[in-house]
Amino acid sequence: MKLKAIILAAGTGTRMKSKMPKVLHKVCGQTMLGHVIDVSKDSKAEECIVVVGHGAEEVQKTLPEGVKTVLQAEQLGTGHAVMVAEEHIETQGTVLVLYGDGPLITEETLNALMTYHQEGKYSATVLTAELENPTGYGRIIRDDDDRLKTIVEEKDTTVGEKEVREINSGIYCFDSKVLKETLPKIQNNNSQKEYYLTDALTIIKQEGLKVGVYQIENYEDIMAVNSREQLAEVEEVMQRRIVKKHMEAGVTFIDPQSTYIEKTVKVGMDTILHPGVILKGATEIGEDCIIGHNSRIENSILKNGIEVQSSTIIESTIDDHATIGPYAYLRPQSHIGKHVKVGDFVEVKNATIDDHSKAAHLAYIGDAEIGKHVNIGCGVIFVNYDGIKKHKTIIKDHAFVGSNSNLVAPITIQESAFVASGSTITREVPAGALAVGRSRQENKEGWVARKGVGKK
């Protein structure tokens, strides 16, 4: 079966009150349209055609390679949207029609819809669900034999039809040839003067062909987004699904409702996520890690047995059994080795810290290469910027940098060298040497009495 997906994404999204095209609003880190494209591909669609309109250029910039677009210059209804994609509809195979603002649709639901469509030998099949409050949706009107009679748009419903709870999801499965032949027959004889895709089903029925209705129990799959409130509702549902998937794979969430984790994140078995954790982008966390409360990790790789306490980690790599935080900040291109400690209020940027080294507290480590078993004392500053460009600091294995020292780059501290506390180091420190870069202490006896300070 040759399958194509047509995704309608031309709407203005007026109720979103946004300068951004509606389908580009994100749910769990990915655009709504991106979610729908992914599910289409997972359902084995050989080709995805996105119908763009409002903000067409912005939408096109976000699309993955291979996804085609057609322009609906005027938004004249769902039928018209599919009409502008007619050149991509062939005379054999199957066409799925989806919406770019419905990010919760699943591969399982689409596969079930297509199986029902194929096994029933239907020319068209509509996906439906029953809602407690169907306001805003088109209604499924059935005949006395419980088969589809017609679909009535919300704005065209009678008082009696408004009471119907079975709604049209807007998702359809068509025989390609039948759809191609039916599109030119759709008229705009309605109060809105729009071309409704629902009319295609009526035409297909009138021509004696079979139209199926596939009703799902989980209405969440077909939730659409037309407002910020609905965006939040959809985000909540997707978060719940993501968390459930991770828990089933052996991840512990101390408080699932307060944890934010994007769809693209990977987490290993027996890792524990505490309340307030935020995991984003291409983050990968290994097994047996503990991610403490209010930690934020983006596009980073954490290996096994790592503990992170209330820290921020951006585009960095952390090797096995390192400890980070509390309140550490790892900025992009940081690589933390095995059994390394990066303690409280330590900031690391574009730096490598090799195995068993530690910076326990209150340090800035920028543009640096630090060897094994190195100690960085409290208050150490890597002075990496001269006002024009950044410079690198290299510290070799087993070196020791005392508290409150400034290392003015470019500089190298050789193996097993020591830097005395309070020093400002401006040139290389040889292996095994002690570097002292501070003025000698001078005590002025009797100074307090002479100045008359201290006592009142």
UniProtKB/Swiss-Prot annotation:
Annotated stretches, region: Pyrophosphorylase: 1-228
Region (N-acetyltransferase): 250-456
GO cellular component, as recorded: cytoplasm; membrane
Principal subcellular localization: cytoplasm
Pfam short name (any one): NTP_transf_3
UniProt-annotated stretches for the region Linker: 229-249
Cofactor annotation comment: Binds 1 Mg(2+) ion per subunit.
Gene3D superfamilies associated with the record: Hexapeptide repeat proteins, Spore Coat Polysaccharide Biosynthesis Protein SpsA, Chain A
Compartment(s) of residence: Cytoplasm
Disulphide bridges: none
Top-rank lineage group of the source organism: Bacteria
UniProt cofactor(s): Mg(2+)
Top EC class for this record: transferase
Homology family: In the N-terminal section; belongs to the N-acetylglucosamine-1-phosphate uridyltransferase family.
The protein's assembly and partners: Homotrimer.
Protein name: Bifunctional protein GlmU
